[in-house]
From Swiss-Prot:
One of its GO terms (molecular function) is N-acetylneuraminate synthase activity. It comes from Homo sapiens. Ubiquitous. GO terms for cellular component: cytoplasm; cytosol; extracellular exosome. This is N-acetylneuraminate-9-phosphate synthase. GO terms for biological process: carbohydrate biosynthetic process; CMP-N-acetylneuraminate biosynthetic process; glycosylation; N-acetylneuraminate biosynthetic process.
Amino acid sequence: MPLELELCPGRWVGGQHPCFIIAEIGQNHQGDLDVAKRMIRMAKECGADCAKFQKSELEFKFNRKALERPYTSKHSWGKTYGEHKRHLEFSHDQYRELQRYAEEVGIFFTASGMDEMAVEFLHELNVPFFKVGSGDTNNFPYLEKTAKKGRPMVISSGMQSMDTMKQVYQIVKPLNPNFCFLQCTSAYPLQPEDVNLRVISEYQKLFPDIPIGYSGHETGIAISVAAVALGAKVLERHITLDKTWKGSDHSASLEPGELAELVRSVRLVERALGSPTKQLLPCEMACNEKLGKSVVAKVKIPEGTILTMDMLTVKVGEPKGYPPEDIFNLVGKKVLVTVEEDDTIMEELVDNHGKKIKS
């Protein structure tokens, strides 16, 4: 069983704990604080466990030329990439306001620290856990510094190889045992054939002492629900108030109705996963009573007869007697009284104390 860890105060993940559902707001708030608050409330009302943003200190995430390059996409909020990103970036004070709002609403609040200085700010903000975006998963100095902060870590694996993920594990594990990996493919929207849910199972084999989850960028909810059925203990999906809004993430995001349905479906699947123990359940008793079969006499069997297979058959009997799986054990035993043809073979009719007699 994968290791359990306390990802947020009082909220454990892994083992038999419910899947932790992260509503990734990212920058789908359009740079509007009120929209961001509406999305936090929406995440809570739909049943998500956590509302998550993306925090960057732009001069530490991008070099000058990257910020100055022209940005002419239909999704652009400025003439340069820097202007575009600044429009979408909340200040430290605004982050504190959003954190307070999430606390009022009653949902956990965190963000991906998109650079080392952003991680420093989030650490100061006292977020419950750090989310490592796929773009920083192979940034080993960043990983080391983040791990040393001591907070739980959720690490996405988009754009990475299995060899890289093994290195990530080896770097983080000695510094901070409280982390998990998310299978992720960095494409928006993600096509089903590129999801590779089987990586979840491979991660579970290679890293059996950490929880494994899934970060999805596909459309719809079916694939994410399947990830939970495969054992994903953390599930992250982007959310939006309107898929048609400006921004490259909106088309791969879930609107309120979809998020609510995702949460309902995940919780339903968790109930359906149930127990690995196979046994006759109380809910099956009525069906078993009506349709369950018993061993019956194929012919009239006189008192003292040693039972052979050609004397026995299996039918729905009234009353119930030996279940079909006991039929081979009855062969070689003696009947204590005469059993009429088509009667149920009852326990009191058979000598169960003596040894089986070879016929």
